[in-house]
């Protein structure tokens, strides 16, 4: 069954490298889609909207507040910098960053409440060493060779995190 969105109103436009091209982002369509998904999954299910890469070029600073008001519970981004930028832009919803390097702005991100995914034993040790309270997820390598804690390090990684009183593993 196809749903017809409501009349569209708010539009955000951004130019591209070629002046003949223009992208028009319909914020009311985005809000409609978020409301529809939330309606379908039910209020007990948390909805994370992934807005990495500036909301895939849609403009995260404009799109995220619309998604939040339409029912998005939290947001996912790739990097700590993206997460901190959203927080600085006034986003107070939970934000999860799942790809980060040990030299990145970890302490700043944790200080402003960014949830992170741990992808390695080294990252687990860095979180413990930071002594900053953190809510985290552990991403495990399951054979796709993308990112995540290697199988050989699973036990030690979970032990390191479990033994740290300032770290809460959410998933």
Locate each region found by the language model.
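Conserved PLP-enzyme active-site core in the AAT-like
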Residues: 40
């Amino acid at each position: 069954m196809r749903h017809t969105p409501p009349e569209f109103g708010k539009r955000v436009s951004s130019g591209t490298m070629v002046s003949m091209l223009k992208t028009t982002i319909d914020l009311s369509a985005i809000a409609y889609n978020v409301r529809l998904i939330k309606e379908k999954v039910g209020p007990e299910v948390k909805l994370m909207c992934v807005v990495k890469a500036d909301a895939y070029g849609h403009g995260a600073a404009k799109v995220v507040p619309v998604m939040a008001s339409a029912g998005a519970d939290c947001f996912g981004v790739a990097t700590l910098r993206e997460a901190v930028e959203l927080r600085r832009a006034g986003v107070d919803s939970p934000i999860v960053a799942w790809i980060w390097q040990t030299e990145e702005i970890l302490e700043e991100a944790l200080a402003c409440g960014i949830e992170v995914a741990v992808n390695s034993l080294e990252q687990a040790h860095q979180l413990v060493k930071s002594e900053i309270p953190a809510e985290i997820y552990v991403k495990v390598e399951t054979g796709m060779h993308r990112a995540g804690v290697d199988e050989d390090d699973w036990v030690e990684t979970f032990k390191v995190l479990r033994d740290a009183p300032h770290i809460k593993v959410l998933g």
